[in-house]
């Protein structure tokens, strides 16, 4: 690492990277994306060689898929010369963290293979569970990378047919995040435009703002194509905001000849310094592993600094969401008998108070967006609309029947007399037609109220299936009883409506108002003066029986207007009294009676296993987010 990097970043490089590593170790990545550098490349792109050169340790090699799990490679620079320490960590049995110290760098490859076999199974399968490898040495940069499986084009023996798609899904899971810098490894001796790794990076980062290209194997470039490689590194072929670097790592022959990583670094330096085409890249700081390490460290630190404000904001949002969910699930039942009784009393009391508040339109405690009165108003308005429509139909019918009156209704009375019996028959017939629609409306509203009560119970007793079942049973029973009482009351009301009665003054006022209205309508229709209209109309009407029939029509319309107003109010009043007020009061009495049976308390407070797990997970999330926020505050 250069002296300039040591001088300028010694105090903040490691703290920045340690901060993100600590957050990742807490498991915060389950909740939100953290700044990272993800390494991707096609199979045999030289990706493993680059990581080996950076970390100073041998990683799994071979043909086919070698990296079978995401590998978090945490490199920590030690000030002690000749110091080396390794540590591997991953999820083992029952989702528990397994951690093992590594004393010898030669054991790293073996330990990674063991971890991969445990996570992805022995063979060639893959897993998206992370393996964390920490390497502390004087020869490594302060840097954390995430190595992803190489992109496979064709399945080999033992691999599932869709292995290529599986790997791409895994890679996209990491590189899609805006917080990730994508390190794309491409061999220098292939057409860069055709590489799958760069295509995938361009799909998620079309402007190349968070993609850095690494060219490998420059010693295998065909003669005559060197200047094309130089143009790529100079960002003249496919533009990437973060640019390109070029490195030369150990080849297979050098590995077999046991060329050390230190020797390979010296060979790389000599290769670029002496190369007729690539020496300019070395002079510009665009070549060799040490320069790559410095660039990656600076990029990661800069990326972390830019991400911190958004990270703090996301943590606060996630904490608020977690607290809201925890409030919804509650604290869970206590273990002490006396406390369990109090817990049950509080639960039931809160629920019954909410049912009463629901029926009176007050604010609810256990659920925010439940207002039954908005639905009731719509239903009551529909009932009023039905009465009005029925009235209009009634008016049309009696106007049509006027001409049939002589044959259908007239008895022995002389012209000019209204037969009261006829009036009663027509009115009663119309009112009877309203009874069954009223009962149907009652049942619809009763079911709507029942659903509201059950929704309230589900929110109040979340995670307590026995308590919820008991509440649902009582809601259903009370609904049936109160609905039956309401139906009886309504049918009684309709029987009373068959008694033709209203206050004289009320009837006279309604009749007079209707008469004035009709006369005004007739005057406007014929366009004559009021006096001449009255005389001509009177002479005409008394010349036949028309006056009698029109008078009957007026009486029928007036009385229906009064009766329909009574019914428009009566149905809502019956519903609000019996199905709301009385039902809530009865439910409160019956739910509070549950506390009398001390033996039933344990049964009622038996918690749903999934809810308990969700609460524990939320508490764990809240704990790690709180710790994460503390890390950020102290940073």
UniProtKB/Swiss-Prot annotation:
Pfam families: Dynamin_M, Dynamin_N, GED
Region annotation G5 motif: where it falls in the sequence: 248-251
GO cellular component, one term: nucleus
Gene3D superfamilies: Dynamin, middle domain, P-loop containing nucleotide triphosphate hydrolases
Region described as G2 motif: spans on this chain: 66-68
UniProt main location, coarse: cytoplasm
Organism taxonomic ancestry: Eukaryota, Metazoa, Chordata, Craniata, Vertebrata
Compartments, as annotated in UniProt: Cytoplasm
SUPFAM superfamilies: P-loop containing nucleoside triphosphate hydrolases
CDD domains: DLP_1
Protein known as: Interferon-induced GTP-binding protein Mx1
Annotated spans, G4 motif: 216-219
Gene symbol of the encoding locus: mx1
């Amino acid at each position: 690492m250069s002296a300039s990097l040591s001088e300028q970043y010694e105090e903040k490089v490691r703290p920045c990277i340690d901060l993100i590593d600590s957050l990742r170790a807490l498991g915060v990545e389950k909740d939100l994306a953290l700044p990272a550098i993800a390494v991707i490349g096609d199979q045999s792109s030289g990706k493993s060689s680059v990581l080996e050169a950076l970390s100073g340790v041998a990683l799994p090699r071979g043909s086919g898929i070698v990296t079978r799990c995401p590998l978090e490679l945490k490199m920590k620079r030690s000030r002690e010369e000749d110091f080396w320490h390794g540590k591997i960590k991953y999820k083992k049995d029952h989702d528990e963290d397994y951690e093992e110290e590594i004393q010898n760098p030669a054991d790293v490859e073996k330990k990674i293979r063991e971890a991969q076999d445990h996570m992805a199974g022995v063979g060639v399968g893959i897993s998206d569970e992370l393996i964390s490898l920490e390497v502390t040495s004087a020869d490594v940069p302060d840097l954390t990378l995430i190595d992803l499986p190489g992109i496979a084009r064709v399945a080999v023996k033992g691999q599932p047919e869709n292995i290529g798609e599986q790997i791409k899904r895994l890679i996209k899971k990491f590189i899609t995040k805006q917080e990730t810098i994508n390190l794309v490894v491409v061999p220098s001796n292939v057409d860069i435009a055709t590489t799958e790794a760069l295509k995938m990076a361009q799909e998620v980062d079309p402007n190349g703002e968070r993609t850095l290209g690494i060219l490998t194997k420059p010693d295998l470039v065909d003669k005559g194509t060197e200047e094309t490689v130089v143009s790529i590194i100079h960002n003249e072929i496919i533009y990437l905001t973060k640019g390109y670097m070029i490195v030369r790592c150990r080849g297979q022959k050098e590995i077999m000849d046991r060329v050390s990583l230190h020797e390979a670094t010296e060979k790389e330096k000599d290769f670029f310094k002496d190369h007729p085409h690539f020496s300019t890249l070395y002079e510009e700081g665009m070549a060799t592993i040490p320069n790559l390490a410095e660039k990656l460290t600076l990029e990661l630190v800069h990326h972390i600094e830019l991400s911190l404000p958004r990270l703090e904001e996301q943590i606060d949002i996630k904490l608020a969401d977690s607290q809201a969910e925890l409030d919804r699930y509650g604290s869970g039942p206590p273990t002490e008998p006396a406390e369990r009784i109090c817990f049950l009393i509080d639960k039931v009391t809160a629920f019954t108070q909410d049912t009463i508040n629901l029926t009176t339109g007050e604010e609810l405690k256990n659920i925010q967006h439940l207002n039954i009165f908005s639905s009731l108003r719509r239903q009551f308005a529909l009932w009023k609309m039905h009465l009005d429509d029925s009235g209009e139909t009634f008016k049309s019918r009696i106007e049509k029947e006027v001409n049939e009156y002589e044959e259908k209704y007239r008895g022995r009375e002389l012209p000019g007399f209204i037969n009261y019996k006829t009036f009663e028959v027509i009115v009663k017939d119309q009112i009877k037609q309203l009874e069954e629609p009223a009962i149907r409306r009652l049942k619809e509203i009763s079911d709507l109220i029942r659903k509201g009560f059950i929704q309230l119970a589900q929110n109040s007793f979340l995670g307590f299936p026995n308590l919820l079942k008991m509440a649902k049973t009582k809601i259903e029973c009370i609904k049936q009883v109160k609905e039956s009482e309401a139906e009886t009351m309504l049918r009684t009301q309709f029987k009373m409506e068959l008694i033709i009665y209203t206050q004289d003054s009320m009837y006279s006022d309604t009749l007079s108002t209707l008469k004035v209205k009709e006369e005004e309508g007739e005057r406007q229709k014929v366009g004559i003066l009021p006096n001449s209209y009255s005389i001509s109309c009177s002479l005409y009407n008394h010349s036949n029986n028309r006056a009698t029939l029109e008078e009957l029509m007026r009486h029928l319309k007036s009385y229906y207007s009064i009766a329909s107003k009574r019914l428009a109010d009566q149905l809502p009043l019956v519903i609000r009294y019996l199905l709301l007020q009385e039902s809530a009061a009865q439910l409160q009495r019956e739910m509070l009676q549950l506390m009398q049976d001390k033996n039933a308390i344990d049964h009622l407070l038996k918690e749903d296993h999934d809810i308990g797990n969700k609460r524990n997970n939320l508490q764990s999330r809240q704990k790690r987010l709180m710790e994460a926020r503390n890390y950020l505050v102290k940073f």
